């Protein structure tokens, strides 16, 4: 299923666990994200469909992320996993500089970055495949912004496309030596 739907950049697989030892009820595939946030130092970049929408020097990147996230409202649904999409990614080790004032200036000095990864990288996850390992059910989820024209129709179209891909008998195979 992952290879059929998520064989692309900006995807992920989350497995739930109970007590750190038992297989959990849900497995969640995050499908290719169109939108992401990258933070390097105190510069926040907002990227949509691979194009930078803006870059801002900010005093507090965590506050910027919190404001960005506040625009998303998703209802709580009974008997569904608590995770329903939103921001997925990582906060790197040096994120502490945004929290601890004593480290702000000490870490602000430019340090070598041999691997070139952002301090924070978050994908906006709109489309999900949710496996309920208890019931054996698979669900396709998508988010639609009611403020966006034709959002509902676009969401239905995305879900129908995902269903067709799932029903197809073929999937992309990983090519040895190419990393894909």
Where are these regions (language model features)?
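Short, charge-rich binding segments
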Residues: 28-29, 75-82, 121
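Extended accessory regions or peripheral subdomains of proteins
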Residues: 1-11, 16-57, 93-180
């Amino acid at each position: 299923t992952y290879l059929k739907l998520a064989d692309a950049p900006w995807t992920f697989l989350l497995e739930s666990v109970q007590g750190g030892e038992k297989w959990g009820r849900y497995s969640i595939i995050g499908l290719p994200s169109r939108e992401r946030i990258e933070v390097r130092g105190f510069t926040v970049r907002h990227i949509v469909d691979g194009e930078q929408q803006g870059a801002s020097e900010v005093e507090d990147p965590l506050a910027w992320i919190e404001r960005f996230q506040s625009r998303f409202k998703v209802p709580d649904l009974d008997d569904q996993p608590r995770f329903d999409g939103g921001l997925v990614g990582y906060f790197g080790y040096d994120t502490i500089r945004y929290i601890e004032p004593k480290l702000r200036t000490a870490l602000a000095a430019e340090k070598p970055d041999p691997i070139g990864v952002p301090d924070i990288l978050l994908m906006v996850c709109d489309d999900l495949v949710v496996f309920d390992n208890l019931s054996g059910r698979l669900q396709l989820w998508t988010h639609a912004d009611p403020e966006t024209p034709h959002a509902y129709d676009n969401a239905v179209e995305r879900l129908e496309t995902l269903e067709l891909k799932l029903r197809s008998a073929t999937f992309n195979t990983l090519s040895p030596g190419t990393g894909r």
